[in-house]
Amino acid sequence: MEKGARQRNNTAKNHPGSDTSPEAEASSGGGGVALKKEIGLVSACGIIVGNIIGSGIFVSPKGVLENAGSVGLALIVWIVTGIITAVGALCYAELGVTIPKSGGDYSYVKDIFGGLAGFLRLWIAVLVIYPTNQAVIALTFSNYVLQPLFPTCFPPESGLRLLAAICLLLLTWVNCSSVRWATRVQDIFTAGKLLALALIIIMGIVQICKGEFFWLEPKNAFENFQEPDIGLVALAFLQGSFAYGGWNFLNYVTEELVDPYKNLPRAIFISIPLVTFVYVFANIAYVTAMSPQELLASNAVAVTFGEKLLGVMAWIMPISVALSTFGGVNGSLFTSSRLFFAGAREGHLPSVLAMIHVKRCTPIPALLFTCLSTLLMLVTSDMYTLINYVGFINYLFYGVTVAGQIVLRWKKPDIPRPIKVSLLFPIIYLLFWAFLLIFSLWSEPVVCGIGLAIMLTGVPVYFLGVYWQHKPKCFNDFIKSLTLVSQKMCVVVYPQEGNSGAEETTDDLEEQHKPIFKPTPVKDPDSEEQP
């Protein structure tokens, strides 16, 4: 096993953007292991759609309506935010094939702006964003499963958290067992939630055919039920943008895509318009059966919709929400574990997280780390508060990443770009992003300030854990022993990869401060010890 741990130093040093297939290298060399390219176009679409469409469209699409002030303006907000999301996704598509590494915006920010910027993106994701989001989705799943058993009261809190933990453990086992199993689960549950939403849309069309379209007539659709306010409209756009969250998750698994140069942009072209269509027409369907006041008063819009129109079949809606959230947990586990895997590979997280199973070729340590951090969030009571604090930071890094696309065009105009979008796209996205960011700072300065403070706690961690390379020998020996024990327990080794630079787990000092992605291999300091 020690030999497996050392094989990262014997792998060929290749450019991160190399197009060599990992399977080809593994089979042609010495039998090394590597991440497998098992995600086809259908599964890629399932990852995007499954991560965007969670429980929100079923449970609480009222956030946009409440702030927009009218049905018509709310529908416009859903359409515009869908278009802006598509624009941002196209920018990420260019970055994804220019810097074809797993890790998504973390990898892009690190390669373009340097190690500290990338680490801060990773730090906030590891510390709060993914553990809290996954915990909330799992709790939503358990709530909709248990609610029918407690028709006259709320399910017990301990029962909710226990079932959420079981959900997380089950899906972690699936993801550890096989990439193919994980993507099949994602495909099935994404199809299920789309079928449920298709049912809602079809019923809305039936309602329109019956003449139930009072709130869709222009004079009624734009009738304000509150005083128009530009600040509230901005909040509506912010709520809409959050509803499309997850559109960038496919970039986290770029190295496992079959033919990423084709399938990454294709999946984006298919998925984002599909989600926009579903969101807009689901909201149209809702207002054919409910007035804006009824919609705003409902705690679970799809359930209320089902009770009004489905009669004895109303049970379909809560089951649909449960299935949707179950698939959402799976998709988030799958993609976030690849983010942590990529961070460990770059030396920003413990190196054991950059290892994969010798037979299954799944990043088991990263998956277990993701699961454990989420389980810890389940036993805390302040995770919703944490989400509010760091939601602003998460959105901040979307803009930083897209700005990096412009910087990369300027600094490295000649590097290969299989996809090259018009510069108008990142400019449009950044203008929209700046509008929302400035308004967020103005309307909730304390919340945004706390979010920034949480992110900046990563600065001393970076300098102590990453920048400071000459640590005491006793510390290095302890980490090496801990890594070896973890490696034996999980039966994992460092992967041999020819397309991602996965064999490097630390950066040298010079590379840490380079602001722009350089298409030359990074020299692994450990390799200097080899004869």
Curated annotation (Swiss-Prot):
Keywords: Amino-acid transport, Antiport, Cell membrane, Disulfide bond, Membrane, Phosphoprotein, Transmembrane, Transmembrane helix, Transport. Residues 65-72, 149-156, 210-229, 287-311, 382-385 are extracellular. It is found in: Cell membrane; Basolateral cell membrane. GO terms for cellular component: apical plasma membrane; basolateral plasma membrane; microvillus membrane; plasma membrane. This is Large neutral amino acids transporter small subunit 2. The modification Phosphoserine is found at residues 18, 21, 27-28, 527. Belongs to the amino acid-polyamine-organocation (APC) superfamily. L-type amino acid transporter (LAT) (TC 2.A.3.8) family. Its main location: membrane.
